[in-house]
Amino acid sequence: MVIFLAVLFGIVGLDRLVIVYLFPVLLPELKLNNTQAGAIASVLALTWAISTWVLGSLSDRYGRRKILLGSSIFFSVMTSFTGVAKSFHSMLLVRGLLGVGEGGVFSASVATIDEISTPRRRGLNLGIHQSFFPLLGIGLGPIIATQLVMHMRWEWVFFVLGIPGFLLTFLIGKTMRKAEASRDKQARSASASPLTVLRYKNIWLTTVIGSLFQTGLFVFSTFVALYLTKVVGLSLGTVGLIISGWGFGGFIGMIAVPAMSDRLGRRIVLVVSAACYGVLMLAFVLCHASPIVMFCNLFAAGICGFGIAPLFLAVIPCESVPSTLTGSAVGVPTAVSELIGGVLMPVVAGGLADTFGLGYPMLIVGGVSLVSALVGMFLEETVPTATSKRSVSNMDAV
């Protein structure tokens, strides 16, 4: 089940990010500027934010399976429909609807894995789940996108990429059918308000960390292809290979870093990894290097940066609240961080790029990562001990 959900989330990452790798082709053809490119990336983050919170809360009440399967079908349809959009406004509409489905997949799948995992394997399992986002979305995504667009029109790229989501939805539906029955019944009995999770200090802190991280993630992913082609002067094929290092490193980091936190503690692993990530991302922009060095830099940065994402988006929120609130606990940090980091900042960064050049948005990434390391120092440790995390309802709440 974990592997199926992980692959599905990887497809979510691929369908979400593939458009930014095609911006060098799309922007001239659709006559769009950098600010509009940022808006296209931002609208998906906006609807993802809303649906993650809303659909995550609904999955607490009505069960994971219904929300997960419905969201999966919907985002697959919208991925294919992206190939039909031929104007700025139609692209905004389709990509916004895509975010609705993808947000539901994220919150419902994280809550499902939290429920089926033992405390000692929770970090590892959630890390495996989220590791497929950078693997398919950022590691293989640039290669897939840039190679496909060399052999077919960009519209057909989106039609092709919509197919895997339907296949995974069918497989997950068959696998979850029996396992979900008892959990659905338990979920319907949950009556707490989704806002109850705001009583817990760690939810607030992971929300801040998530906002900083998502700022760096989506500013970088939105403009890195444009930066490397227009400023550095590299070919689109070379750019795809360089960016893939970020994703391949992220795949390793999202498994290794949460697994390390199972043994060493969530807080110390998050703080150290975030600090290393910030330094490496600043070096990527400030130190002009060859393509192979840039690949290696992003590979190392991906290990550190993406490695902490399962901690503040899933592991720590889930371990900080009672089991009946895990969907909401995941939804709040994700929703707010998507609104700030995914909606607002790409547009701001696009304005900076139009005014001062594409190098300025790249500097944002390293700076916000260093700040997130500082905020992480104030987290309360949640790593499981002899006492199950389900006794967390007795913890002090803010």
Residue ranges of model-derived segments:
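Juxtamembrane intracellular "pre-TM" segments in multi-pass secondary transporters
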Residues: 179-207, 397-398
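Helix-breaking motifs and short loop linkers at transmembrane-helix boundaries and internal kinks
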Residues: 31, 63, 84-90, 233, ...
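Conserved MFS/SLC helix-loop-helix module at the cytosolic interface between two early adjacent transmembrane helices
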Residues: 50-86, 261-267
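Helix-loop-helix hairpin linking two adjacent transmembrane segments in secondary transporters
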Residues: 129-174
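Extracytoplasmic gate region of multi-pass secondary transporters
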Residues: 19-20, 202-254, 314
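Cytoplasmic helix-loop-helix junction between adjacent transmembrane helices
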Residues: 94-133
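C-terminal transmembrane helical hairpin of 12-TM major facilitator-type secondary transporters
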Residues: 267-316
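C-terminal membrane-cytosol helix-exit motif in multi-pass small-molecule transporters
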Residues: 163-183, 375-380
